[in-house]
Amino acid sequence: MIENISKLIAEKVSSELNYDNERKEIIQYGTYALIQTLISIISVLILGLVFNIALEALIFLFTASILRKYSGGAHSESSNVCTLLGIIISICIGFLIKSSFFAKMNFELVVFIGIVIFVFGYFIVFKFAPVDTKNKPIKTEKKKKRMKKGSLKILTIYLFIEVLSIILYYNSGWSLAKPVMLSIIFGVAWQCMTLTYIGNILLKTIDSFTNKLL
């Protein structure tokens, strides 16, 4: 269905602007990706509001997705399965952060976990990113360097948000500091894991199991 809609939009735009087949394919791919992104965001938002985990689930989703744009990583063979997994994982992480275990966790421990994850994140990104796939090969060294640099910049922005959250917590007792920090921490950890061999094996296993169910 999504593929048909994106194809119709691409054909309409290409016809109006007299684009060749190459440009039409680019428009179709971009439209397809945009629709899937919107489906993910809207689905996570609705389910998050229903279960009162919207903040945590959405921050996790955006954290992992934005970093993924630059760092690459293991993908599901089916883009539809990939979208579904993203929604499910985001909701599960939202529930996890809202659980009594993390709700009762000492703030200093959250800070410590954050330090560990960011050290791990910088190491993994510096060593492995960007990770391409058969469907999305990175063909030039220049692009690889640009994507690695982008990944490190995104990580640094996340680190800045973490530090700012800590400052706000200690200065004004900001009540959302812990869930915001944990959501970013989980997002960074998950995305960086997909850059590793273990993450690749894990996603392939989940992908195989999901395809059997569908």
Curated annotation (Swiss-Prot):
<keyword id="KW-1133">Transmembrane helix</keyword>
<comment type="similarity">
    <text>Belongs to the AgrB family.</text>
</comment>
<keyword id="KW-0378">Hydrolase</keyword>
<dbReference type="GO" id="GO:0009372">
    <property type="term" value="P:quorum sensing"/>
</dbReference>
<dbReference type="InterPro" id="IPR006741">
    <property type="entry name" value="AgrB"/>
</dbReference>
<comment type="function">
    <text>May be involved in the proteolytic processing of a quorum sensing system signal molecule precursor.</text>
</comment>
<feature type="transmembrane region" description="Helical">
    <location>
        <begin position="154"/>
        <end position="174"/>
    </location>
</feature>
<feature type="transmembrane region" description="Helical">
    <location>
        <begin position="41"/>
        <end position="61"/>
    </location>
</feature>
<keyword id="KW-0645">Protease</keyword>
<dbReference type="GO" id="GO:0005886">
    <property type="term" value="C:plasma membrane"/>
</dbReference>
<dbReference type="Pfam" id="PF04647">
    <property type="entry name" value="AgrB"/>
</dbReference>
<protein>
    <recommendedName>
        <fullName>Putative AgrB-like protein 2</fullName>
        <ecNumber>3.4.-.-</ecNumber>
    </recommendedName>
</protein>
<keyword id="KW-0472">Membrane</keyword>
<keyword id="KW-0673">Quorum sensing</keyword>
<dbReference type="GO" id="GO:0006508">
    <property type="term" value="P:proteolysis"/>
</dbReference>
<dbReference type="GO" id="GO:0008233">
    <property type="term" value="F:peptidase activity"/>
</dbReference>
<feature type="transmembrane region" description="Helical">
    <location>
        <begin position="109"/>
        <end position="129"/>
    </location>
</feature>
<feature type="transmembrane region" description="Helical">
    <location>
        <begin position="179"/>
        <end position="199"/>
    </location>
</feature>
<keyword id="KW-1003">Cell membrane</keyword>
<keyword id="KW-0812">Transmembrane</keyword>
<feature type="transmembrane region" description="Helical">
    <location>
        <begin position="83"/>
        <end position="103"/>
    </location>
</feature>
